[in-house]
Amino acid sequence: MDAALKRSRSEEPAEILPPARDEEEEEEEGMEQGLEEEEEVDPRIQGELEKLNQSTDDINRRETELEDARQKFRSVLVEATVKLDELVKKIGKAVEDSKPYWEARRVARQAQLEAQKATQDFQRATEVLRAAKETISLAEQRLLEDDKRQFDSAWQEMLNHATQRVMEAEQTKTRSELVHKETAARYNAAMGRMRQLEKKLKRAINKSKPYFELKAKYYVQLEQLKKTVDDLQAKLTLAKGEYKMALKNLEMISDEIHERRRSSAMGPRGCGVGAEGSSTSVEDLPGSKPEPDAISVASEAFEDDSCSNFVSEDDSETQSVSSFSSGPTSPSEMPDQFPAVVRPGSLDLPSPVSLSEFGMMFPVLGPRSECSGASSPECEVERGDRAEGAENKTSDKANNNRGLSSSSGSGGSSKSQSSTSPEGQALENRMKQLSLQCSKGRDGIIADIKMVQIG
């Protein structure tokens, strides 16, 4: 029984499950539906679509009409060609013989039309001139009849305008009169030639008259059809321009909608990276200074000492000689040229030489002799002794100061120490100890930095 139930269940067709839809597709469809529900259709789109449809209908209609007009023009042209060829074969040589007459007749007709137009222009100019002259005469007559009326500025302006119109009308009349004379002369010449040819070719003219009359008829008909084709072509161009403008407006609206969607998806612009927890204003930045730690202070002191120790010997000699030769005579008058550098107390070096001893180390030459500039032998000897003594003293001071370094950053210009042997020896020993301490301190600082980086 159980086996039969299992067999029947296995024989039953399995239910067909619908294919699993991708989650991304479902999300995209949901987003599209949400956007369609949230956003309303821009009313401008409907108006532009209506214009687009109307322009499309106009273009189709104008193209159809234009094609029909062109087809009709071609059919009339073919018909005229066929019939005229038949008449030429029927009439024969008379058509060629009478062509000069019919050409002269066409020229005379054209000259007649031009003469008629010139006559109308001349008549119009004559009427304008007559009216302007009547206006001036009436104005002058009213001014003379009224004794109480004064010749004021308004009356003068009115007369000036009337006079100007009279002058313009006279110029127009003169030009139209010249044109009328020229056209009349051409018309008379054309008519005279046509009469001469008519007398000369009377028989050929009568024989070929049906041909040229039919040709003139078809010519007028073809001219009308050509004008219709030109009008339809202009209307078609206008309809295409409206269609193009509607497409351009739709494209602009689409760009605006996409830009609005993009900006709404991005959201408002927030603060920059690292500015979330910053409550300090820009005005407080100059007042806030970082507190120096031990490593930074030691490194600054080491840099100051190393810079002062590596001053070249030539610079120290030159600075010592120039500073004491051109500076003030007393140590108290020497200005402090550079501000003092802050450093830890453990690295301060007490100076073994006081300022009062600079006078002993570098004695200043006494006042110049009264005979400076004289040419006596005594003055020459005195100047030579002074120069030789100054050179000896300068060389001795330079030799004694080669092993010393002055604190140029804290005390202004480089100052030489005393040349006495006990004090110079003590200063040299102290500088050696300081350089050893600085090197040890630098090694320790570098080791601490490496440990911090490793940690």
UniProtKB/Swiss-Prot annotation:
Compositionally biased region (Acidic residues) = 22-41, 306-317
Q: Where is the composition biased (Low complexity)?
A: 320-332, 403-421
The UniProt entry lists membrane topology as: Peripheral membrane protein
* Coiled-coil region list: 44-90, 97-145, 154-200, 211-255
- List the residue ranges of the region (Disordered): 1-63, 259-293, 306-345, 369-435
List GO BP terms, alphabetically: intracellular signal transduction; signal transduction
Q: Name one GO cellular component term.
A: cytoplasm
Name the organs or tissues of expression.
Highly expressed in testis and ovaries. It is also expressed in a variety of tissues including spleen, lymph node, thymus, bone marrow, fetal liver, colon, small intestine and prostate.
**Mutating L349A: what's the consequence?**
Loss of phosphorylation and binding by phospho-JNK
Recorded family membership: Belongs to the SH3BP5 family.
Q: What is this protein called?
A: SH3 domain-binding protein 5
Q: Name the species this protein comes from.
A: Homo sapiens
Tell me the organism's taxonomic lineage. Eukaryota, Metazoa, Chordata, Craniata, Vertebrata
